[in-house]
Swiss-Prot record:
Binding site for ATP: G67, P68, E69, S70, S71, G72, K73, T74
Similarity field: Belongs to the RecA family.
The protein's name in its UniProt record: Protein RecA
InterPro entries membership: AAA+_ATPase, DNA_recomb/repair_RecA, DNA_recomb/repair_RecA_CS, P-loop_NTPase, RecA-like_C, RecA-like_N, RecA_ATP-bd, RecA_C_sf
Signal peptide feature range: none
Organism: Clostridioides difficile (strain 630)
Highest rank taxon of the organism: Bacteria
Keyword DNA repair: yes
CC per GO annotation: cytosol
SMART domains: AAA
Amino acid sequence: MSVDQEKLKALNEALGKIEKDFGKGSVMKLGEATSMSIDVISTGAIGLDIAIGIGGLPRGRIVEVYGPESSGKTTVALSCVASAQKDGGIAAFIDAEHALDPVYAKALGVDVDNLIISQPDTGEQALEIAEALIRSGAIDIIVIDSVAALVPKAEIDGDMGDSHVGLQARLMSQALRKLTGSIKKSNCVAIFINQLREKVGIMFGNPETTTGGRALKFYSSVRLDVRKIDTIKQGDKVIGSRTRVKVVKNKVAPPFKQAEFDIMYGEGISKIGDLLDIAADVDIVKKSGSWYSYNDTKLGQGRENVKKFLEDNLDLTTEIDEKVRAFYNLNEEHEESGTSVSKEIVEE
């Protein structure tokens, strides 16, 4: 059905005026792929990149990472920071909890010398610093750790027993209204780490909820639920934890996929272990009993031994990595709602 020419002329005039007043790209047709392409930053865990569906965290969007204490939330966020820095990006970390361990961050691959860090006194200060950094257009990824620690100034200045109902939720709602547009324009990934609380008096359904009100749930394009599901031991010594990340909200691909990987204490996400699991799942690496093989090469017996073998043979590891990425089309363009979605694949 043809569009009325008078309407089309009026529309083009209106679009021209809007672009003149507000800048090119302020309004467009959804099918204009070049204007709507979404780049990504790898999470550093290939299984999680696959679960998100586009090969990593989408740039220009807000991401919420939440879960119980010591589940691996900050480790996942720092792994994303390390990936961005390896690709030449600039990263910032708003440490509202005043708990960032630079030694651990360095072990995860973070370039701590060039990491921009702030340890603000109040929630308002934290979010204003974040806004200023994002508006500069120079930041590729920013992490706010955590939402629960973004305490409003009125609460800090008040007495211990004072009631401040809804103050933090209003602060988050106001801040996110301002930040969303700036994050999109700067093509930055904004990761908000959040904690869990339990609703009082819930008899049925899930009593868990995140702090800071509902605004972050709405504004987030991706929400990741991080849980520790098992402990990794070497004899009697605990050396890490098995972690499951579920994509509970996803605006750029189908949601509810999940990834499992090892977080080794003092090392972070076991990237080679994650790659081995994914490769075995899709038969790129063959598994027979406890033996692993790739093409005509026997990799070894037992998962830990094979991980060590792959660590010592990085050329072979790179070859397997490329085959896994090709299998899941992580090196190709994807279409999302009629929009071309391109990705930056970060070399592990």
